[in-house]
A protein has these predicted regions:
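Alpha-helical structural motif
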Residues: 13-16, 40, 81-85, 171
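A general structural-boundary detector
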Residues: 4-7, 34, 76, 102, ...
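Glycine-rich beta-alpha loop elements in corrinoid/cobalamin-binding modules
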Residues: 1-69
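N-terminal [4Fe-4S]-dependent radical SAM core
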Residues: 50, 57-108
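Radical SAM [4Fe-4S] cluster-binding motif and immediate context
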Residues: 83-172
Length: 172
C-alpha cells in the first residue's frame, strides 16, 4: 500500500486529525522534504506510514505482515489511538447536509463507543474498545439542539449496543 497511501490513522481521529494537519504543515513550513515529513507524522501516536516499515509474507497465512521500521527510528508496534473522553469532542448537533429531511428521517446521536459484550465474532466490538460513554446530560443537550436546528422530530441514539449503555433508561 505504500505506493498509494502515505499514512493511516489507526484508531479514533478526533484529536489526531488536527495534530496530523499541524504536524504536516509545520514540517512543510520548515522546508522538510516529503520523507522527513512522513517520518515526523509516523512519530504521532496511531499514525502508520507504510513506506517507513519493512514487511514480510507470513508463511502460515500468506498475509503481508509489518516486521518493524525499515530505516528511520519510528515507533513499533504502532499503537492504536484511543479517545478516552468522548465528551471532550461533543457530537455535532447539526449536519453538513442541507435539507436532511430529503435524505434522513431522523437525527442520529452517538451515545457510546465500544461494546461490553466482547463477542469473538464481532470485529467492531474488538476494534472500538475500550467502552466509552457520553455524559447523559450532554446527550440530552445535544438532542435538544439537534432537534431545534434540524426541524426533525425523531432522534436515534447510536452505539454498537445501545441497550447496554449504562444511562439508556433515563435517556429514553
Amino acid at each position: 500500500m505504500a505506493d498509494f497511501i502515505d499514512a493511516f490513522l489507526i484508531g479514533d481521529g478526533e484529536e489526531a486529525a488536527a495534530e496530523i494537519a499541524l504536524c504536516w504543515t509545520s514540517a512543510k513550513r520548515e522546508g522538510l522534504g516529503r520523507r522527513a515529513r512522513l517520518v515526523r507524522l509516523a512519530n504521532l501516536e496511531g499514525v502508520y506510514v507504510p513506506s517507513l516499515y519493512a514487511t514480510h509474507v507470513d508463511a502460515d497465512t500468506g498475509l503481508e505482515v509489518v516486521s518493524g521500521p525499515a530505516l528511520e527510528p519510528v515507533p513499533f508496534p504502532i499503537r492504536r489511538r484511543v479517545l478516552e473522553n468522548l465528551d471532550r469532542f461533543p457530537f455535532p448537533d447539526d449536519g453538513p447536509v442541507g435539507g436532511p429531511e430529503a435524505i434522513f428521517d431522523r437525527m442520529s446521536i452517538e451515545v457510546a463507543r465500544g461494546c461490553t459484550e466482547g463477542c469473538r465474532f464481532c470485529q467492531a466490538g474488538m476494534i472500538y474498545r475500550p467502552v466509552r460513554e457520553r455524559d447523559p446530560l450532554e446527550v440530552v443537550r445535544t438532542v435538544e439542539r439537534a432537534l431545534e436546528k434540524s426541524g426533525q422530530d425523531e432522534v436515534s441514539l447510536t452505539a454498537l449496543s445501545t441497550a447496554d449503555v449504562s444511562a439508556i433508561s433515563p435517556l429514553i
